[in-house]
Amino acid sequence: MRLLIGTLFVVVCTAGFFMSSVLADNTPAANAVQINIFNYKFDPETATVPAGTTVTWTNKDEIPHTVASSDKGFKGSSGLDTGDSYSYTFDKPGTYKYYCTLHPFMTATIVVTAKGG
């Protein structure tokens, strides 16, 4: 009986350790924003973030897309196949419009505010 309780204790502790690791890995950073590309849209179409935020675009569509700055305000991506991601850190406040070069009707905006404001 003592062996059974000891074994159960070890199993529960081990499972708890692994679950906390998995949950910690899935928690987004405070200075990170996720934008999904799906159904020929960027979601959300407008994101407001403080300077220093990393924005990650993930293509969840069945066809390739890109992320391209409308005014060369930031470095854009190359083609993103299904499941591919592209990240960029916005350090300067401003309004950044972007689009998909393969589907120019797909447009969106990142508004970067000063840190803390």
Q: What are these language model-derived features?
A:
Residues 2-11, 16-117:
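Extracytoplasmic copper-binding redox domains, predominantly the cupredoxin/blue-copper superfamily
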